[in-house]
Amino acid sequence: METSSHHPAPVRIGIIGGGLMGREAASAFARWFALVDFPVKAELVAVCDVQPEVLAWFRQVPTVRCLTADHRELLARADVEVVYVAVPHHLHETIYLDVLRAGKDLLAEKPFGVDLAAARRIRDEAVKLGRFVRVSSEFPFLPGAQRLQ
């Protein structure tokens, strides 16, 4: 979506899991504006975490309109298009599937699933629903990662 050639419409983002990685992601989204002539702008609009003291940090982000302890409330919002999830590993499958089924695109943390079967279930749901999923790896060029390719 683009409002004009000089002012692209923002991609509105929600974060589930506001700990260290959630704060890092929020900071990265804020720095996105430094990218000159980049066709996409990010706008963080909603954050979910079960700890009130973690959510409090996000009050300083002027674009955030929703702070909640319930990820389903975040996912029900029409103003959230993409969701970054940074929760404990054992919650990945459940929350990733909830994100996809809510019609949102997913920025996922590794591991994608706690095992191969979980990863396949998430992948299959994303394909079935036609959702975009990105799992980031900060070390793709380490020897072990290269051997797996």
Positions of the model-derived regions?
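Short helix-capping segments at alpha-helix termini
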Residues: L35-V40, A102, V127-R131
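A contiguous active-site-proximal alpha/beta segment in oxidoreductase catalytic domains
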Residues: G113-Q149
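Structured beta->alpha junctions
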Residues: G17, P88, P111, S137-P140
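Structural signature of beta-strand start/N-cap positions in the alpha/beta core
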Residues: R12, E43, D79-V82, D105, ...
